[in-house]
Amino acid sequence: MARIVGVELPDNKRIVFALPRIYGIGKSTAEDICEALGIDPMQKLGELTPEQINTLQDYITAHYKVEGDLRREVAMNIKRLMDIKCYRGIRHQRGLPVRGQRTRHNARTRKGPRKTVGAKKGKR
């Protein structure tokens, strides 16, 4: 298993399918990286030489924000929205959909499981 940017990638997978296991790199970015470095995307990761793996790692760290740095930036962006108390920040704080989706009938993923509200039995 090759370690690139702190992530263990399987040797038996092709490069274009192994690179998206790194947070911040998707399919098209993986293809762009292979094209920029002149590496065959259908080549398996285990077939790369240590020099090629080093150039791959250097290229990724130089041109892309991945893993911890990217996670930290996303978290800081959300925290900034919550600090300035804008609409999107308030939606994040309340755990509701941020991008304008309706919440009357859906949004179960953001709202979590249903909370049962029981009615109190009154006097008759």
Curated annotation (Swiss-Prot):
Disulfide bonds: none
Cited InterPro entries: Rbsml_uS13_C, Ribosomal_uS13, Ribosomal_uS13-like_H2TH, Ribosomal_uS13_bac-type, Ribosomal_uS13_CS
Keyword Ribosomal protein set for record: yes
Comp. bias regions, Basic residues: 101-124
Pfam (any one): Ribosomal_S13
Cellular-component GO terms for this entry: cytosol; small ribosomal subunit
Protein origin, superkingdom: Bacteria
Region described as Disordered: spans on this chain: 95-124
Keywords from the UniProt entry: Ribonucleoprotein, Ribosomal protein, RNA-binding, rRNA-binding, tRNA-binding
Gene Ontology BP terms: translation
GO molecular function: rRNA binding; structural constituent of ribosome; tRNA binding
Function field: Located at the top of the head of the 30S subunit, it contacts several helices of the 16S rRNA. In the 70S ribosome it contacts the 23S rRNA (bridge B1a) and protein L5 of the 50S subunit (bridge B1b), connecting the 2 subunits; these bridges are implicated in subunit movement. Contacts the tRNAs in the A and P-sites.
SUBUNIT field: Part of the 30S ribosomal subunit. Forms a loose heterodimer with protein S19. Forms two bridges to the 50S subunit in the 70S ribosome.
Sequence similarity: Belongs to the universal ribosomal protein uS13 family.
Name listed for the protein in its UniProt record: Small ribosomal subunit protein uS13
Organism: Coprothermobacter proteolyticus (strain ATCC 35245 / DSM 5265 / OCM 4 / BT)
Gene: rpsM
